[in-house]
């Protein structure tokens, strides 16, 4: 019997992963975000920060703070540079997620442990989890969400999407698939259903 089910939420860009995680959290699950963890490492004078500066150049730091927009402009569209950055960040992100899981499991306060990991399959991390939930949405819907939220161009959307593995590959390996082409309320109902199903799996 598992003490605390490890669940990863993944999916393509702007599919609704973060919104699904928000609902899980409201229902009582513990939620951690790989993106937020990686952003927490971006401190100029830290060991990780210095490695990022060595890779991308000092211009990514403005007023003693990493400028994520400058970093994005450098790495999206340059796959080699992007993968080199990920090689610095991702092992540390996985370490933090696993440390946090051990801590949360000891506390015995939460019914589920949820980790939002956008590049779950790309970094070969799926096996660590007990279940994988894939959030999907049609490309035109995702593109519209992305451009509306970020004010970035369609080109920027496709550059970022290039880092993700194919939708078909993710569909093949996911345990649960949640389609998110509708409203936030529709997504909430679907997440609630799976929350109680997963909670009952313990």
Swiss-Prot record:
Listed Gene3D superfamilies: P-loop containing nucleotide triphosphate hydrolases
Superkingdom, natural source: Bacteria
Molecular function GO labels: ATP binding; dephospho-CoA kinase activity
Principal localisation: cytoplasm
InterPro entries tied to this protein: Depp_CoAkinase, P-loop_NTPase
E.C. numbers: 2.7.1.24
GO BP: coenzyme A biosynthetic process
Enzyme kind, highest EC tier: transferase
Domain DPCK: 6-202
Keyword tags: ATP-binding, Coenzyme A biosynthesis, Cytoplasm, Kinase, Nucleotide-binding, Transferase
Cell compartments where the protein resides: Cytoplasm
Segments forming a coiled coil: none
Positions with a binding annotation for ATP: 14-19
Pathway membership: Cofactor biosynthesis; coenzyme A biosynthesis; CoA from (R)-pantothenate: step 5/5
GO CC list: cytoplasm
Catalytic reaction equation(s): 3'-dephospho-CoA + ATP = ADP + CoA + H(+)
Cited NCBIfam families: dephospho-CoA kinase
Function: Catalyzes the phosphorylation of the 3'-hydroxyl group of dephosphocoenzyme A to form coenzyme A.
PANTHER family per the UniProt record, alphabetical: BIFUNCTIONAL COENZYME A SYNTHASE-RELATED, DEPHOSPHO-COA KINASE-RELATED
Family membership: Belongs to the CoaE family.
Name assigned to this protein: Dephospho-CoA kinase
Protein species of origin: Chlamydia abortus (strain DSM 27085 / S26/3)
